[in-house]
Amino acid sequence: MFTLIVILAVSYLIGSIPTSIIAGRLLKGIDIRDFGSGNAGGTNAFRVLGWKAGLTVTILDIVKGAIAAISVVVFFESHPIGPLPDINPIALRLIAGLSAVFGHVFTVFAGFKGGKGVSTAAGMMFGIAPVTTLIVLGVFLLVVFLSRYVSVASILAAIAFPVIIAVRKYLFDLGEGLDYYIRMFNTNVFIHDSLDYHLLIFGFIVAAAIMYTHRANIRRLLSGKENRVKFHGHS
């Protein structure tokens, strides 16, 4: 139990690193939460600080989730400070990753007012199920391109993750669909993911959490006041 608590604490602290707030302080001497949408995330960094800073913040937030889901757990597996918890390995990585997402949303370093957790959740999922996450990324980019609403893309991508896991696990694994034909050609790139039922359950939990953190965006969408992204950007 002690090791699990330490893993959760370290993952939370990693997730709590307020990348967009740090970027705002360093680049413009501002608290990014006082501008744009008021959110301490990558999307608002794009709006307030420009595309270069926004992209950097987004990448770093993704890395936070991946580190928590992979590196933190692997470190304590190879450098034990006590017995590891008797938990399914995928579930343990998901719990660590979710702790990082929680840290991003409720960062201890900035008054527990952080971002929405989309990028950090994406990093967690990429570390565990890279192929599925890349498919979800395609969904995200397509929706952004067509609608120019990052919030809509984030919500739909979050919902798409568990749906894709379910389709691949319970449909393609029956010997039908793309997975079957890829196996016929002795290529396993499409089936590297850990299609574990824990992943499916946590996928739905994360989707619900993402929808909850986007509740203000949903209200603005319904009232026609949600901001659209501009592709030309600025530095």
UniProtKB/Swiss-Prot annotation:
Any matching Pfam family: G3P_acyltransf
Reaction equation(s) it catalyzes: an acyl phosphate + sn-glycerol 3-phosphate = a 1-acyl-sn-glycero-3-phosphate + phosphate
E.C. numbers: 2.3.1.275
One biological process term in Gene Ontology: phospholipid biosynthetic process
Topology of the protein relative to the lipid bilayer: Multi-pass membrane protein
Function: Catalyzes the transfer of an acyl group from acyl-phosphate (acyl-PO(4)) to glycerol-3-phosphate (G3P) to form lysophosphatidic acid (LPA). This enzyme utilizes acyl-phosphate as fatty acyl donor, but not acyl-CoA or acyl-ACP.
Name recorded for this polypeptide: Glycerol-3-phosphate acyltransferase
